[in-house]
């Protein structure tokens, strides 16, 4: 796992996606809160600062890394160079008292790369990560993570590009103001699912999408789960979701 070590990630998809690659944010790493003891009502819980949030920065490979670390430690993200998408990342991180560690997967057209990482951070400020194969990442926190996720803001039809580990293409996705997701058609591949604001109250949606049809890239009947982030300034959505085995998944970037 080296934030871009796998060559040719999402090959054939890169030039198309350059037009819409958005400045979402993201790697970072876990989130956890400590609780207070049985004291009187005037005593506030003690909170432990972690790496939860959106982070963006540059890796030693020269790629721009954009990742999100959820409150449960899951990390999701993309990396790009000069506006060209290079790949996707998924991992799990733990952090406390300014140090972090974790492991994850890097998805590319040639397969999967796995690895571990460790580093240091200042909560809601900066982060430094070193991977097991020598790669490094230095990132900064984005306060956009603090904005509540809104289904009414997310709703609309997005035109963009979708990719799996081995294939890519253009597509349009419609999301209703209740969070219903639909793309494709029953005659080829119909994708249906839901987007739900995370209970954390942050600017992240939980997504679940099921594919039905003989031409579906991930196979008929496959369900993927993951997250989505909507950037209000660019009117673009990023969705990253994996199958149950975490052996493949999809990346969608679209604009409405």
Question: Residue locations for each model-derived region?
Answer:
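Long, low-complexity, polar and repeat-rich extracellular regions
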Residues: 33, 38-70, 74-81, 85, ...
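Extended lipid/amphipathic-ligand handling interfaces
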Residues: 67, 91-93, 118-121, 192-200, ...
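Extended, hydrophobic interaction surfaces within ordered domains
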Residues: 97-137
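N-terminal glycine/threonine-rich, aromatic-flanked beta-hairpin/loop signature
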Residues: 54-99, 164-213
């Amino acid at each position: 796992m080296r934030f871009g070590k796998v060559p040719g990630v999402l090959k054939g998809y890169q030039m198309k996606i350059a037009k819409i690659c958005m400045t979402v944010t993201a790697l970072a790493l876990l989130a956890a809160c400590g609780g207070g003891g049985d004291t009187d009502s005037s005593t506030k819980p003690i909170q432990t600062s972690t790496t939860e949030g959106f982070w963006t920065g540059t890796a030693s490979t020269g790629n721009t890394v954009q990742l999100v670390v959820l409150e449960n430690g899951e990390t999701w993200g993309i990396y790009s160079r000069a506006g060209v998408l290079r790949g996707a990342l998924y991992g799990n991180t733990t952090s406390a008292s300014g140090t972090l560690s974790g492991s994850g997967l890097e998805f590319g057209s040639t397969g999967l790369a796995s690895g571990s990482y460790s580093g240091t951070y200042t909560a809601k400020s900066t982060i430094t990560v070193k991977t097991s194969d020598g790669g490094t990442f230095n990132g900064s926190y984005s306060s956009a993570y603090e904005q509540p996720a809104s289904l009414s803001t997310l709703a609309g039809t997005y035109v963009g590009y979708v990719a799996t580990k081995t294939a890519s293409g253009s597509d349009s996705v419609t999301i209703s103001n209740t969070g219903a997701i639909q793309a494709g058609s029953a005659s080829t591949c119909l994708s249906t699912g839901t987007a739900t604001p995370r209970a954390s109250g942050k600017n992240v949606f939980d997504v679940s999408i099921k594919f039905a049809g003989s031409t579906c890239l991930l196979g008929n009947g496959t369900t993927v789960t993951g997250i989505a982030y909507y950037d209000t300034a660019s009117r673009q959505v990023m969705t990253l979701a994996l199958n149950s085995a975490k052996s493949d998944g999809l990346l969608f970037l679209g604009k409405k």
